[in-house]
Every structure is written in C-alpha cells, then in structure tokens.
C-alpha cells in the first residue's frame, strides 16, 4: 500500500519506545462530543446480524488485538494463514458514517482496516455497508480511538520489524472552530508522536481537513515530529507542504457539498522515517 496521489487538492531518528504501560494516562480533554442521533432500523439490524463478527470489544490489552492480527504479533493461524501476516494493516480514526471507509476497503481487498468510531449510528451505517458490499477486511472498535491506541496497539519494535501499522487515516476530524476550543483538536504533538511510534518505518499518517487553520496546525505539528517526514514537500512543492489527494480517498457527499460552495480541502501525508 502506498500514498501515491493522482488528484491534487488545494493549495530516522531512533524510534520512540512508548508502550501501553507508559501511556496508561489518558487525555483529560476529549476531542469529540458524543452526538445524539437516531439509529435507523437498517443500522440496528446490521449491528445485530454483523456486529458479532465485525465488531471487536474494547479491551485495554495489547494481546486482544494481537490474537486477531498477525501483523501485531498474533499467531497467523488465527487470521487466515501465514499470508495474513503480510497484509497491510490500517488504523482509521473516526469514520463518521463509514462512506469513505467502505469505499477504500472495497478498493483494497488485500488490506485490513481497523476502524474506531464512538457514534452508534455511524457504526451501524458501516456495518450495513459491509453487508451490502460483501466486505471482509474491516473490523470495528466502537470506542475512543486514542484509548484504543494507547492500550491495545503496541509501538513498533525494531526486534520485530514486520509488525506494526502500515498506515493511519484521520479524515475530517472536528476542527473545533472557536479559538477557546482549539485545545480539543485531535492533532496535537503528543498524540501525533504516539501515532507515529506505531507505524512501521515507511508507513504513513494521512490526515485531511476542510478547515484551513486546522490544516496549517496539522502541517506544523506533523512537521515538528522527529519520527515523521513530509515527502510531499519534495515531490509536490507547489502545494506548500500539503499532499495531492491520494487516489484511494473518495469525495464524500459532505466534501462535494463543501467544494461546491468554494471551500478548500487539504490532505497531509507524512511518512515514518
């Protein structure tokens, strides 16, 4: 899997040795609000019928995911044979209603997607699409992605170089427009460093936003992290440090509406050194 792009958007140091035991503290300020929303009958049916197979219960232990994914050190026999350990593994943080997630998973059937979302209708909507499209490469944890990362996903370890995440997707996180709420933005230095520590060397963090001040903050924070490098600054200097939109990320209905109103969209793709 790579982050090569086709459509432009608007304008190694030693690895961090963070382990879940060192990250047991969770941020006091959450970056999301649990929205109230009605789960439709179709979404509820998808949860009942497909949830037992595709939803992984939150368990604050690295062994819980390792037992499912050989990419994280689990036995290959539990995940479809030895070839499963060679499949790319992507963490998606906050998938909304799952439109982009389902599109990308369908486009990349040989890649596994571990997707976190706290909004119940969104979980139901993605499960519904999994059933309709016959997808098999998505698993969902209906829990705060930061707690999942801190307690269930180990940092990359040079002693097991093939284990770890190949990519992390963070598309359109809440921009928290008001200045007094900026501290709630998800993309902050400490979190980015912990995300980067879980990528394999060469893996990448792909962020997208339609709020320019947040795009500028992302570019600064990602650029300051010693584990990450911005290859787009060299390959597409005309974009000012942003990346062309990778071909795999679709235009969602929300994004199309924004573009129709003249709003910009900024992609950022930073690779692990």
Where in the sequence are the language-model features?
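A short SAM/SAH-binding and catalytic strip from SAM-dependent methyltransferases
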Residues: 166-185
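A short glycine-rich, Lys/Arg-flanked "PGG" loop and its adjoining helix->strand segment in the class I
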Residues: 187-201
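SAM cofactor-binding core of SAM-dependent methyltransferases
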Residues: 85-150
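Conserved class I S-adenosyl-L-methionine
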Residues: 180-181, 208-224
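Class I S-adenosyl-L-methionine
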Residues: 220, 224-273
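S-adenosyl-L-methionine
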Residues: 2-91, 99-108
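Conserved beta-strand signature within the Rossmann-like core of class I S-adenosyl-L-methionine
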Residues: 201-209
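A short acidic, Gly/Pro-enriched loop at the edge of an enzyme's catalytic core
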Residues: 151-167
């Amino acid at each position: 899997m790579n982050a090569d792009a086709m459509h432009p958007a608007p304008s190694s140091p030693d690895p961090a040795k963070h382990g879940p035991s060192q990250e047991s503290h969770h941020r006091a300020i959450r970056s999301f609000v649990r929205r109230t929303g009605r789960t439709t009958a179709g979404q509820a049916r998808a949860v009942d019928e497909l949830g037992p197979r595709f939803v992984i219960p939150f368990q604050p232990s690295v062994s819980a995911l390792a037992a499912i994914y050989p990419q994280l050190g689990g036995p290959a026999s539990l995940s479809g044979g030895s070839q499963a350990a060679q499949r790319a593994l992507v963490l998606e943080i906050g998938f909304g209603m799952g439109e982009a997630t389902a599109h990308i998973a369908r486009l990349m059937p040989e890649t596994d997607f571990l997707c976190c979302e706290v909004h119940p209708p969104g979980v139901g909507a993605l499960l519904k699409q999994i059933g309709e499209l016959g997808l098999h490469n998505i698993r969902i944890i209906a829990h705060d992605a930061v707690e999942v990362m801190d307690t269930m996903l180990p940092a990359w370890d040079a002693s097991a170089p093939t284990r770890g995440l190949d990519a992390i997707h963070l598309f359109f996180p809440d921009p928290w427009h008001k200045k007094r709420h900026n501290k709630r933005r998800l993309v902050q230095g400490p979190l980015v460093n912990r995300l980067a520590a879980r990528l394999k060397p060469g893996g990448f963090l792909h962020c997208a936003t339609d709020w320019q001040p947040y795009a500028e903050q992302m570019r600064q924070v990602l650029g300051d992290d010693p584990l990450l490098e911005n290859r787009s600054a060299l390959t597409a200097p005309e974009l000012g440090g942003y990346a062309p939109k990778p071909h795999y990320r679709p235009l969602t209905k929300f994004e199309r509406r924004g573009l129709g109103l003249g709003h910009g969209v900024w992609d950022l793709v930073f690779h692990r050194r």
